[in-house]
UniProtKB/Swiss-Prot annotation:
Any one of the GO BP annotations: translation
Superkingdom of the source species: Bacteria
Protein name in UniProt: Large ribosomal subunit protein uL30
Gene Ontology MF annotations: structural constituent of ribosome
Ribonucleoprotein found in the keyword field: yes
Species whose genome carries this gene: Glaesserella parasuis serovar 5 (strain SH0165)
Gene name tied to this protein: rpmD
């Protein structure tokens, strides 16, 4: 079984770079306090690093 992580959006995506909005969409986050469980892969970690100022990660 693959390790999973919980990612929660903590800040709004309004007035952000289009690239960062697309990253949130790729992570499956839609609004503030929305939480998703994702597989812990290098690709997902890279997306989280790109928008780290808008999300919280629980391992």
């Amino acid at each position: 079984m693959a390790k999973t992580i919980k990612v929660t959006q903590t800040r709004s995506s309004i007035a952000r770079l289009p690239k960062h909005k697309a990253t949130l969409k790729g992570l499956g986050l839609r609004h503030i306090r929305h939480t998703v469980e994702l597989e812990d892969t290098p690709a997902v970690r890279g997306m989280i690093n790109q928008v780290s100022y808008m999300v919280k990660v629980e391992e």
